[in-house]
Each structure stands twice: as C-alpha cells, then as structure tokens.
C-alpha cells in the first residue's frame, strides 16, 4: 500500500531565480510565449512551501507545468498562488492601512519627517471603471484627503513581494534534490517579421534581408536565452483579464539589433519553428531585431497591374447582381509590383512568415531610395511572392462600360467593357489588366479583342504589351446565362 504523504510543511524554500543560461523561450506572433526555466529544488519529505519569484508579470498561472526532466521524481503541486500585481505606492499604502508611518515633507526648503496614520490607502475604487479614491491620512489628530509628504515605508515582512512570484506547496514522499523545469505561458510578448528588398537600377536581381523583431513587455528580463519563433495561426484564447502594462512600469524603450542568420525552419504540426542559432539577452520593455534571412541574387520581375473596377460586383446567395450601376465606377491608376519565386533555385526556398516588405532602389549614385512597402502574407516554399509597392507615374488607364443588356425571357445578360492603356514611359511595358466577372456564376466571354487567361471562377486577365507613346485598347463582352427567374429586372 502506498504510504500517505506527511501534510505538515517542513521547509520553506525561496527560489530567487532560475539557473543561469538555462532559460528558453518559444515566442508566438500572437502576443504570448512559452517560458521555460530550470530551478534548483531541495525538498524534504512531506509538503514544502516554495517561492519562485523570477516570474513574468503577465504569466498565465493555470498553465504552469513543474516537472523533473529526467522523469525520476513525481512533483506534486498541491496548491499554487500567484502574486502578479506590480508594486506601486498605492499598493504599499494599502499594506500599511490602519498603521502609522513616516512622511518626508519639505517646508521652506527644509526637510523634516512627520508621522501620519493611513485611514484609507486610496487603492480601493468606488466602481470598476472609476479611478481610485483619494487616500485619507490622519496627522496630529486631523484628517486630510492627500498625502502629507512622501511616504517612508517600514521594512517589508517576508510575506510581502515586490516582484511577481509563484507560491507552491510541493509534496514529495522522500527528500530530493533536483534541477526541475518550470514551463508556463505569458502574455505581452510577441514577434513580427520584416523584409528589406534591395533592387538595382539596371538588374532584376534583388537582395532580400529578413528580420525578426521581438517586443518584450512581460515585466521580466531574459539573459543568455535560447529563443524559438513560432509562425502560424494557432488557436489561443486571450487572457481572462486584460493584461495591461501599469503606467508605473513604463520606462524608456530600448531598441537593439543583432546580425545572426538563421534560415532553417522546422515543421511543428501545422506551423513552423525558427530556432535562433545563438543565445539572446532580452531586457524587459526591450525591442530587439535579429536577422533570420539573407539572400543574394534573387531573380525578380517588375510587373504592372490594372484592376479597373473601383468596386467589385458579387452574387448574393442564389441571386444574381443585375444592378445596372454595379461595377461601372473605375480607377485610372496602374499599380507597380515585384514578384519572385520562393525557391531554393532562386536562393530562397524557406517558409517565409507574414511580414512587412520594404523595397529600396539602388540608384546610379549607389544611394538607396525607398520605393514602397507591402504587408505580405505567409508564403510557403516554392510559391510566388507578389508585392504591390505603389502606382506607376507614367502609365494611365481608362475603363468604360459600353453595353449592358438583360433578356428576361432567355434568362441572360450581356455586358461589354473597353479598357484603354497609355504608356508615357521611354521603354515598352506589359500591363496585366484583370477583370472580375461577378454578376452570376455561369458566364462566358462571347467576344474579345485580345487573348486572356482565366485566373479563377470569376477573374480574367489580359497581358497587354504597350510600346512607348502608344495607347492600346482592349475590349470584351461577357454573356451571363441561366439567370434565376426570381430576380427582379431593373
């Protein structure tokens, strides 16, 4: 028969911090991380009171896992308390409520100390959304609604904490010394990716630099830490209580950069893990950049795209959109984009996390000029990255609807458009004119001036070469068939 554990606490252990160099982080781009640390435990048989104070301010207490990595010791946490409030002047006034403490005040340039009894600390709120109440202090038998000076607090007892900490009651049947691993999730830390793409004036080869930025607002610093970045849309519930950084905790933001390169990504279920090859030190409220990608000689292509319709026409449920005014309003701007294939043959070939791409052009004088940016989605290996960087200055487009006719008896509708593309540049260009065919599900192009490509169920694309100074006209007619009879014809 298994013997019952002794329930009397035999020892109180204070773990001030984890083992140096044994901390690791798995940071997700959804404002949370898994924090892992190694703590030295010296437990006696029975129930031990243990205090671990090296905890993130926005830790998720219910996520705590304390274990023996070797699997030899079964650590049983019978009870856990988390003290996570940041200590402020109001907090300490509340601790000494009902007691008399000293206050330092200045009168006519001279300092002196006066005693005052804390009747009310001011930490209590009259309602959840209301600001704290004013403190009430008794000085010389008189009550006042403000502090008489700077409070000078007495020495704190051992049960008071100024840093977030876990208090555990850990049961073990026999005495044991071990290096235990603690793991828990914490909010207020995240990472995001940025890409700098450098193009040359006379070449389609580009340089791609990828950076990961860590933003740490957990209330905890990490020294010499192993870091993994997890990319993907992971289902994670938000904190039950909104985690807000207290105003008292705000300090000057520290921004540092590193130059380590890591382009190895490993699969984790349906996500990807990027492991940084070197250890990182990350202070609280620090933002740090580390380089994870550097690719030279990436073959790219500048493209011009004209999506003329200012608003899309879409079917609604089982009903066709036969509104005569739908899809008529058009744009005159031709967008500029860069595209390249994310393949090993093109010096890339790694899963690229979503991030902002900034494009720079190296001019003839070798100086870099900013030419646009784009929020790129996550891109799997071998897929094409297409990033829109702005609008072409010397390319102009017009889009005009030339016909719209509905035949209720035949359940059909026809619609015709003409697109004009003008090139004011000194060199020839090719413009991709994309048109959305969205009034109804069944359609066909009954007439066209140029060949087109059907991109999907509702999109066609014309690749139109335009020489310098030329205006090209592209026209087409779409025939919608099998229109539902219940649609009201305008």
State the predicted function of each range.
Residues 2-4, 10-490:
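Long, intrinsically disordered, low-complexity accessory segments associated with secretion
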């Amino acid at each position: 028969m298994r013997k019952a554990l002794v329930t009397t606490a035999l020892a109180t252990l204070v773990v001030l911090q984890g083992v140096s160099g044994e901390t690791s982080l798995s940071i997700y781009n959804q404002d949370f991380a898994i924090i892992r640390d190694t703590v030295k435990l010296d437990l006696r048989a029975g129930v031990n009171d243990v205090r671990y104070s090296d905890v993130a301010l926005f830790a998720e207490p219910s996520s705590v896992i304390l274990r023996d990595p070797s699997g030899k010791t079964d650590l049983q946490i019978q009870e856990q308390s988390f003290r996570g409030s940041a200590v402020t002047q109001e907090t300490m006034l509340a601790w000494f409520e009902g007691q008399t403490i000293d206050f330092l005040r200045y009168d006519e340039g001279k300092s002196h100390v006066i005693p005052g009894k804390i009747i009310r600390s001011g930490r209590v709120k009259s309602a959840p959304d209301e600001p704290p109440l004013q403190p009430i202090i008794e000085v010389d038998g008189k009550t006042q609604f403000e502090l008489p000076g700077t409070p000078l607090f007495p020495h704190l007892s051992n049960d008071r904490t100024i840093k977030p900490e876990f208090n555990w009651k850990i049961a073990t049947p026999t005495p044991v010394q071990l290096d235990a691993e603690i793991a828990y999730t914490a909010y207020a830390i995240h990472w995001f990716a940025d890409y700098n793409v450098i193009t040359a004036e006379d070449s389609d080869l580009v340089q791609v630099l990828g950076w990961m930025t860590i933003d740490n607002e957990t209330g905890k610093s990490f020294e010499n830490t192993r870091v993994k970045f997890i990319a993907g849309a992971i289902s994670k519930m938000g904190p039950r209580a909104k985690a807000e950084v207290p105003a008292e905790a705000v300090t000057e933001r520290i921004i540092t950069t590193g130059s380590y390169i890591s382009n190895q990504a490993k699969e984790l279920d349906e996500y990807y893990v990027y492991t940084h090859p070197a250890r990182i030190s990350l202070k609280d409220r620090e933002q740090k950049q580390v380089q994870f990608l550097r690719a030279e000689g990436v073959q790219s292509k500048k493209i011009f795209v004209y999506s003329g319709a200012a608003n899309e026409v879409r079917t609604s449920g089982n009903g066709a959109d036969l509104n005569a005014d739908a899809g008529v309003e058009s744009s005159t701007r031709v967008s500029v984009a860069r595209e390249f294939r994310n393949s090993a043959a093109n010096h890339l070939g790694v899963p690229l996390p979503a991030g902002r791409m900034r494009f720079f052009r190296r001019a003839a004088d070798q100086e870099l000029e900013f030419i646009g940016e784009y929020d790129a989605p996550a891109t799997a290996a071998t897929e094409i990255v297409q990033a829109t960087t702005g609008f072409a200055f010397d390319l102009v487009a017009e889009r005009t609807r030339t016909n719209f006719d509905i035949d209720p008896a035949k359940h059909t509708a026809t619609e015709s458009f003409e697109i004009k593309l003008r090139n004011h540049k000194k060199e020839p260009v090719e413009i991709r004119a994309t048109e959305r065919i969205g009034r109804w599900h069944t359609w066909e192009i009954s007439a066209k001036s140029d060949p087109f490509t059907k991109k999907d169920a509702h999109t066609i694309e014309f690749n139109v070469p335009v020489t310098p100074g030329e205006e090209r006209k592209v026209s087409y007619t779409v025939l919608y068939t099998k229109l539902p009879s219940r649609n009201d014809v305008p």
